[in-house]
Each structure stands twice: as structure tokens, then as C-alpha cells.
Regions:
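Cell-envelope/ECM-targeting effectors and their regulatory/trafficking segments
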Residues: 8, 14-168
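Active-site-proximal binding-pocket segments
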Residues: 1-8
């Protein structure tokens, strides 16, 4: 089974659906409009199996539907970016794949302290950010998206300088 697939996520689909605890069957993701960015069909062996949305840079970078094998990679190193790197390198070796199609956006220059302050502000409002450690993991990203939705702001699911000024 593959580790994951780069996908296009329609704006109407909340980035707050990210996380290993929010798996859905492939058909459910497809019904929401998620498609492989390559234009290829998903492998038939993925039908009926749970896949998980991963948006490591929120709306500012590539998005993925990952399989449980992605989380096997994370058993060695809990970093989403580490597991993405290993999975992507394996695809490049096995299939001759190129770069991710979606570009990584400029994410700014927030410090871990900046992100930790935002996390504490979100926690004070009842959000589960996974702990105020200054790292924008999936719980922090989706908490940002939920907060943005509640504020009637476009949800980006990623900490930014403008968000830092708002979330205190």
C-alpha cells in the first residue's frame, strides 16, 4: 500500500478535517471533491479503506491523502515533514516521480515562541492544539482553521504573522 497521494482540496472543504483521527473512506473524500493533483485515478486497492487528510502548510502548500503507512514512517520520527520526505524519496526511486506539483508558499518567519503564544491563546479558548510547544502540528493547524471559521475568516490552518497579531 502506498504512503499517500498529493491531492487538490477544494476551498469548500475545511482544512480542519486534517488529522489521523479523522480518517474517511476514499469515496467520501472524492464526494467532497478531492482529486489527485496528478490527474491519475487513485489505485483500486485504496477503495473502501481509510485515508487521512494532511496539510502540513495549511492552505499554503501541498495537501495529501495519506494511508496508515504514512504513520508507520512517523513511528521513527514524529515530524510530518520527515515522513513526507521519506515517502516522496521512495516514490522518486520506485516510480521516477518528480517534485510535488503544488508549490510550498512563503510561510513567514514566526518563531517557536510566537507559535506557542498562539497555541496558548487557542487553548484558553478551548481548542486542543496538542500542547503549546511552538510546533504547528496537525492539532494546532486544525485548531487555527476552526478558530478562523468561527471568526468568519478564510481558513488557512496555518500560523501567520497577521494571525499572531490577532490571536493573543
Amino acid at each position: 500500500r502506498d504512503w499517500g497521494f498529493e491531492v487538490a482540496v477544494p476551498e469548500a472543504v475545511s482544512c480542519a478535517l486534517e488529522g489521523p483521527d479523522q480518517g474517511r473512506k476514499l469515496a467520501e473524500w472524492q464526494a467532497m471533491g478531492l482529486t489527485r493533483i496528478s490527474g491519475k485515478a487513485f489505485p483500486a486497492n485504496e477503495n473502501g479503506k481509510d485515508l487521512f487528510l494532511l496539510m502540513p502548510a495549511g492552505r499554503y502548500g501541498p495537501a495529501f491523502l495519506v494511508t496508515p503507512n504514512f504513520y508507520v514512517l512517523k513511528a521513527y520520527n514524529m515530524s510530518d515533514l520527515y515522513a513526507l520526505f521519506i515517502g516522496h524519496v521512495s516514490d522518486r526511486i520506485a516510480y521516477g516521480s518528480g517534485d510535488f506539483i503544488t508549490a510550498w508558499g512563503a510561510l513567514g518567519s514566526l518563531t517557536r515562541g510566537d507559535i506557542a503564544r498562539m497555541q496558548r491563546a487557542l487553548e484558553a479558548q478551548g481548542h486542543d492544539v496538542g500542547g503549546a510547544d511552538g510546533l504547528p502540528g496537525y492539532k494546532t493547524r486544525r485548531s487555527i482553521g476552526r478558530w478562523q471559521d468561527a471568526q468568519s475568516q478564510p481558513s488557512t490552518c496555518f500560523p501567520t504573522s497577521p494571525l499572531k497579531a490577532t490571536l493573543r
